[in-house]
Amino acid sequence: MDELQIIEYDGIRVLTSQQIADAYEADANLLNKNFNRNKDRYVEGKHYICLQGDELRGFRAKGQIDVSPNVNKLYLWTEKGALLHAKSLNTDKAWEVYDKLVENYFRVRSAVNSNL
């Protein structure tokens, strides 16, 4: 969890589904199932960003992370989206890691910006 690669999109820190699954020690397919089962609770732009087409090509071109050429849709999760995943998994590990994500991943950028 301490070695998460930092990913930013439009100036906000985000995580990929795989990063969340790895950090929460969960199966990425389970995260996907939970998301699809509760999709009406997730708000695009607030909980996640879905990149496709030109947006995905532009994101790939920036080279922040390797995105397979076979991927035609990439979900990036915000702090609030990571919270919903922790809630749906409801494991001790997910809650523990979520707290660390807030303190050490999502909040770091806002702390740096407020000191400028």
Annotated model-derived regions:
Residues 1-116:
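An anion-engaging/catalytic patch
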